[in-house]
Regions:
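Terminal, low-structured helical/coil segments at or just beyond the last alpha-helical repeat
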Residues: 24-44, 217-247
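Canonical positions in the second alpha-helix
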Residues: 79, 112-113, 146-147, 180-181, ...
């Protein structure tokens, strides 16, 4: 079966609007102006600090894209040291950790993001991936459900939810999840392949072939090769119709 990952590409954007009054005549007005100037200075300092955190964040994203995961983590750590309440940095740090197979550390990072912003669907989605990698399928399912509740059109979460359900032997529920993903994005070749796996695990040769055929039609070489060795097809692999499809 095929997983889907995502990372947060959005930056930390802060907009400051400054206003100042005209000439001041009274001592009260002068005091107010001094306070305003002090506030403006503080805002400028905060803006520079935020910009520095954003620079480290974008550096981390660049390193993550380049698969330099250890360096990406260091960059995100620097961003977090400046701005600890940054869910985006915590999420992408978790993705780098997941890529290094440090799943428990990744979970801790996603949990920090969720504590800061509970409705951040990327945190729940990637948390589900880490839990799936740890074979904690029920917990993964709960995380994917959270992600989908926040962003119903997140078809990647529906795909991975289907995988978790398959691992729990809830094949019909898995297929329903895959069908929801297809309703959002009809040309999802990996979904047809995963549906084929779910049907094969139930010894449903006809529907396994039907869905595998759709996956092969979209990406021929990949899925013919996968299906030849994927253990999910062990119940139907010896069947003539299945063998003919892989020719």
């Amino acid at each position: 079966m095929v997983f889907r990952r995502c990372f947060v590409a959005s930056g930390l954007i802060v907009f400051f609007a400054f206003g100042c009054s005209g000439g001041a005549n009274s001592s009260t007005e002068n005091t107010t102006q001094v306070v305003q100037e002090s506030n403006v200075t503080q805002l400028l300092i905060e803006a520079k600090t935020t910009q520095k955190a954003e620079d480290f964040f974008h550096q981390g994203n660049h390193l993550l894209d380049g698969q330099r995961y250890e360096d990406a983590i260091k960059a995100y750590d620097q961003a977090i040291a400046i701005k600890v309440e940054s869910p985006e940095a915590w999420i992408n740090r978790g993705i780098a950790l997941t890529s290094l197979q440090r799943y428990k550390d990744a979970l801790a990072s996603y949990d920090r993001a969720i504590a800061i912003k509970p409705d951040k669907y990327e945190a729940w989605y990637n948390r589900g991936i880490a839990l799936t990698s740890l074979q904690r399928y029920k917990d993964a399912l709960a995380s994917y459900d959270k992600a989908i509740a926040i962003k119903p059109d997140k078809y990647e979460a529906l795909i991975n939810r289907g995988i978790a359900l398959t691992k729990l032997h809830r094949y019909q529920d898995a297929i329903a999840s895959y069908d929801q993903a297809i309703a959002i994005k009809p040309d999802l070749h990996q979904v047809y392949y995963n549906k084929a796996c779910s049907y094969a695990l139930q010894s449903n040769l006809e529907l396994a072939i039907e869905n595998l055929d759709k996956a092969i039609e979209l990406v021929p070489d990949k899925y013919k090769k996968l299906a030849k060795t994927d253990p999910d097809f062990s119940k139907v692999r010896s069947k003539r119709q299945f063998q003919e499809l892989l020719q």
